[in-house]
């Protein structure tokens, strides 16, 4: 008897140690940002010609449309990314599904409710229902619904979708929800082939899809219950065969986004925007304090089941960098948004004012997928050979892939611009070429002077002309004279 108890205790203790170790590894923000768990590309890639992408094909459903970017293009395959844009109409429900790859969603427009179902987590939301007869009289039958947490999303939110975790979205607003989804195919969480696969838990994709500028094709995809035998499925779930066939959605032609006639009846707490912001700040402080004491890790329930799945990146008051004459920059990484340790992705939102310039930079530890939300921006990207691989204007609805280490320079057009950049590292960071904390500011004057064959005065001008500006620059240096430089300065040598 004692031996049996000891054996059980040993097994339980070992399981707890494994859980503690895995949780600490997944959620520990001190993970080396220079290291990435991505598998990398399995092919020789050439990033010598970049292009601005628009959706290539779309699949319509009853209450919305899903638009796919060209996943077969070399740039998507080499960066290991998959991108879709989805529109959900009012009272539209994106049916539950899960994916083999983690992803980030940015809500461009609209608001609604969403759910992530983490395995093993308790149903913390409980709701009582009373059935009524057709005459409105209460019947004796009552039932209770229990489910996991429901999250409210709105414009400007970044939503994390871990691989293998079922999720759903519902539009409870008056306008369509428009969202851009970026999936990381090369993430180590994906042990299947390097392709994005969605496993539908309901509905199907037996819809006609249109390829932009080309033909119309038939697209077919059933939910996972369709592959099980009806008898075996009914026995496993304890239901009759009629109900099992409904789960298989064999004759359901609504697609993956379905219309909810009278709206979803959901139990959800309501918070004002101020309350939500205060709660988010409190959670950040609480999370930061937890990291100071590793012994506070308490396994599955403390982390997965209570972790925040969305954060708003559009709020001006939470900008990381702000220039009142140029614009603002806001970022989310695993330090601010712990679930990104599971996703291994991060995001940066940039709002540039009229003719403002973003300090030239390169992404140190990630690829960057830039989606233009509003306005236009002139963009130039340079390769390791010093050649321009992209020089054009990025317009609303277009996507530009910027490979890791490629230098980039952006300038807003007259109407300004707003864009979201999704990056393939949970703690992505950049190296700026100009302004405060830039490469030039970090170099000694003599190094700059001798490297470019210029005087020390000219080197100091290069280092300091942008003063204390960081990130977004004002356009005030257009057509202006730079101290220490003249038209003949190219022939000058260092002192």
UniProtKB/Swiss-Prot annotation:
Quick one: where's region Disordered? 464-495
Q: Which gene encodes it?
A: GLUB2
Q: What is this protein called?
A: Glutelin type-B 2
Query: Which family is annotated?
Result: Belongs to the 11S seed storage protein (globulins) family.
Q: Which UniProt keywords apply?
A: Disulfide bond, Seed storage protein, Signal, Storage protein
Q: Where is the signal peptide?
A: 1-24
What is the native source organism of this protein?
Oryza sativa subsp. japonica
The record's section on InterPro entries has: 11S_seedstore_CS (IPR022379), 11S_seedstore_pln (IPR006044), Cupin_1 (IPR006045), RmlC-like_jellyroll (IPR014710), RmlC_Cupin_sf (IPR011051), Seed_Storage-Functional (IPR050253)
The task this protein performs is described as: Seed storage protein.
One example of the protein's molecular function in GO is: nutrient reservoir activity
Which GO BP terms apply? seed development
Q: Could you tell me which SUPFAM superfamilies the record lists for this protein?
A: RmlC-like cupins (SSF51182)
Q: Which cysteines are joined by disulfide bonds?
A: 45-78, 121-305
Which residues belong to any copy of the Cupin type-1 domain?
50-245, 311-460
Q: Which PANTHER family match?
A: 12S SEED STORAGE PROTEIN CRB, OS03G0336100 PROTEIN-RELATED
Indicate the quaternary assembly: Hexamer; each subunit is composed of an acidic and a basic chain derived from a single precursor and linked by a disulfide bond.
Instruction: Write out the transmembrane intervals.
Output: none
């Amino acid at each position: 008897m004692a031996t049996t108890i000891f054996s059980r205790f040993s097994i339980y203790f070992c399981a707890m140690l494994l859980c503690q170790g895995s949780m600490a590894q997944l959620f520990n923000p001190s993970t080396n940002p220079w290291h990435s768990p991505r598998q990398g590309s399995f092919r020789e890639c050439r990033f010598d010609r970049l292009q601005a992408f628009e959706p290539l094909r779309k699949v319509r459903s009853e209450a919305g449309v899903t638009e796919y970017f060209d996943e077969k293009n070399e740039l998507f395959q080499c960066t290991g990314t998959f991108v879709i844009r989805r529109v959900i109409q009012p009272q539209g429900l994106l049916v539950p599904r899960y994916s083999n790859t983690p992803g980030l969603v940015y809500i461009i427009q609209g608001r609604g409710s969403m759910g992530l179902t983490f395995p093993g987590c308790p149903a913390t939301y409980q709701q009582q229902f009373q059935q009524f007869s057709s005459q409105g009289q209460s019947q004796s039958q009552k039932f209770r619904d229990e489910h996991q947490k429901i999250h409210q999303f709105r414009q400007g939110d970044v939503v994390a979708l871990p691989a293998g975790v079922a999720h759903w979205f519902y539009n409870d607003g008056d306008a369509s929800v428009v969202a851009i989804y970026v999936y990381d195919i090369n993430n180590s969480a994906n042990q299947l082939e390097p392709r994005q696969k969605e496993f539908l838990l309901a509905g199907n994709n037996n819809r006609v899809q249109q390829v932009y500028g080309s033909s119309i094709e038939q697209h077919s995809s059933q939910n996972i219950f369709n592959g099980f035998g009806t008898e075996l499925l009914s026995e496993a779930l304890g239901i009759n065969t009629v109900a099992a066939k409904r789960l298989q959605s064999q004759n359901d032609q609504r697609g993956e986004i379905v219309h909810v006639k009278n709206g979803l009846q959901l139990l959800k707490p309501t918070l004002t925007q101020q309350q939500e912001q205060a709660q988010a700040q409190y959670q950040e402080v609480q999370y930061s304090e937890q990291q100071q004491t590793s012994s506070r890790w308490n396994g599955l329930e403390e982390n997965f089941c209570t972790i925040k799945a969305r954060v708003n990146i559009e709020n001006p008051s939470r900008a990381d960098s702000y220039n009142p004459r140029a614009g603002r920059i806001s970022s989310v990484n695993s330090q601010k948004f712990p679930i990104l340790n599971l996703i291994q992705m991060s995001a940066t939102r940039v709002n540039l004012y009229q003719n403002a310039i973003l300090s030239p930079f390169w992404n140190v530890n990630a690829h960057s997928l830039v989606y233009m939300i509003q306005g236009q921006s002139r963009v130039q990207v340079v390769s390791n050979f010093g050649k321009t691989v992209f020089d054009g204007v990025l317009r609303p609805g277009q996507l530009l892939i910027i490979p890791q280490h490629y230098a980039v320079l952006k300038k807003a057009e007259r109407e300004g611009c707003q864009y979201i950049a999704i990056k393939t590292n949970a703690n992505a960071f950049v190296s700026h070429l100009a302004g405060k904390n830039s490469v030039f500011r970090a170099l000694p004057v003599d190094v700059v002077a001798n490297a470019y064959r210029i005087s020390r005065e000219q080197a100091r001008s290069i280092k300091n002309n942008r003063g204390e500006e960081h990130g977004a620059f004002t356009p005030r240096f257009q057509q202006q004279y730079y101290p220490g430089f003249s038209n003949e300065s190219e022939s000058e040598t260092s002192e």
